[in-house]
Amino acid sequence: MVSSLAACGYHLRGKGSFWPPQMKKVCVPVFKNSSGRFELDLKLTRSVINELVARTGVTIEPDKGRADGLLLGDIISFKVQPIAFSSSGAASRYKLTIITSVVFTDLVNQKVLFSDDSFTYVEEYEVAGGVDFESMETQAIDRVAEKFARQLVVNLVEGF
């Protein structure tokens, strides 16, 4: 069945043909954190690196001078807003929004391949009664970092 799907032009989302063949080593410095949220830069960067390697097979190169590509990110905004409340008036559901500026450059050809000044990821999450908000928020950020990375890398690979 897989061969028949491949024969008809079917391909998995996130495995598009956009990825430049010369892009073997990519430098991904830690995202700049203009949001003020502690360690968000480290979590997003780590997740983006993991997703980029998994989807493209590139090697992460810490030295920009030896890299074929450069992915820069700046976390502009991080907001958590209550959107639902329990009968006692306590927030039970939150909306988490991360806005970043992202630029991916082909260093071999000196060409910007992807640029988005307001790359936005939104996620909603529940807070169970009696659970500490801070620990729930930290767990939500860990999950959101992975989903953010997946969305960003799919956009890079698909060429949007």
PLM features: residue spans?
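Surface-exposed short loop/turn segments
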Residues: 55-58, 66-114, 118, 122-135, ...
